[in-house]
């Protein structure tokens, strides 16, 4: 299916016909575009630029190298925070599940002996503060993950690098504390 008429491009346009020195995202406007936001299409290839880069919201547009540097740092820190939040949630979950109590009680045994019987009590409730906190943190984590995905989907190379580098740095800084849990019921070690 030929879509070249939709984008005002010739099917004979080759790599030598493209302007590689631009700092703007690839133009994907319809030929009859009046510059309205509805007629703009998302870039479908990676590009390295800092002019007219729209990030998350219509009013949040990067137009200078300084703004791109600031956006890079902000996205990098957001990706780091996301990784830290994942590890922090695991730690909170582990702490909230430590509320397991063992109760021992004497019971009569054979030949008149007394044995100690131990019962395990797990105290988890749906309407508890730890569960509500986990729910709020989960919502925050989901929103941040979608923001990072949408930032990556701008196809701006600088912002994509910021997401990947921030996530990698966050994992490096926070995941070493991650507990290694071995499932004793797993038979494929």
From Swiss-Prot:
Record topological domains on the Cytoplasmic side: 89-131, 177-189
Keywords for this protein: Cell membrane, Copper, Copper transport, Disulfide bond, Endosome, Ion transport, Membrane, Oxidation, Phosphoprotein, Transmembrane, Transmembrane helix, Transport
GO MF terms, alphabetically ordered: copper ion binding; copper ion transmembrane transporter activity; identical protein binding; silver ion transmembrane transporter activity; xenobiotic transmembrane transporter activity
PTM (free text): Proteolytic cleavage, leading to a truncated form, is facilitated by SLC31A2 and initiated preferentially by CTSL and to a minor extend by CTSB in endolysosomal compartments. A post-CTSL/cathepsin L processing occurs to yield to the fully truncated form.
One of the protein's GO biological processes: vascular endothelial growth factor receptor-2 signaling pathway
Annotated source species: Sus scrofa (Pig)
Residue stretches of biased makeup (Low complexity): 20-36
Lineage: Eukaryota, Metazoa, Chordata, Craniata, Vertebrata
Gene, per the UniProt record: SLC31A1
Residue spans crossing the bilayer: 68-88, 132-152, 156-176
Family per similarity comment: Belongs to the copper transporter (Ctr) (TC 1.A.56) family. SLC31A subfamily.
Gene Ontology CC: apical plasma membrane; basolateral plasma membrane; early endosome membrane; intercalated disc; late endosome membrane; plasma membrane; recycling endosome membrane
Protein name: High affinity copper uptake protein 1
Modified residues (Phosphothreonine): 113
Record localization: Cell membrane; Early endosome membrane; Recycling endosome membrane; Apical cell membrane
């Amino acid at each position: 299916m030929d879509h070249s008429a939709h984008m005002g491009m010739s099917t004979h346009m080759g790599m030598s016909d493209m302007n590689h020195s631009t700092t703007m995202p690839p133009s994907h406007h319809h030929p009859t575009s009046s510059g309205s936001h509805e007629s703009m299409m998302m870039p479908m290839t990676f590009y390295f630029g800092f002019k007219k880069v729209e990030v998350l919201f219509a009013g949040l547009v990067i137009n200078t190298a300084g703004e791109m540097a600031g956006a890079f740092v902000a996205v990098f820190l957001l990706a780091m925070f996301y990784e830290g939040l994942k590890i922090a949630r695991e730690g909170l979950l582990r702490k909230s599940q430590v509320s397991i109590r063992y109760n021992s009680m004497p019971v009569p045994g054979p030949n008149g002996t007394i044995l100690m019987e131990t019962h395990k009590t797990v105290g988890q409730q749906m309407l508890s503060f730890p569960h509500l906190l986990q729910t709020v943190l989960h919502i925050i984590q989901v929103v941040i993950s979608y923001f990072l995905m949408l930032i990556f989907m701008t196809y701006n190379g600088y912002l994509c690098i910021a997401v990947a580098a921030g996530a990698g740095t966050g994992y490096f800084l926070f995941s070493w504390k991650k507990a290694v849990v071995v499932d004793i019921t797993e038979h494929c070690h």
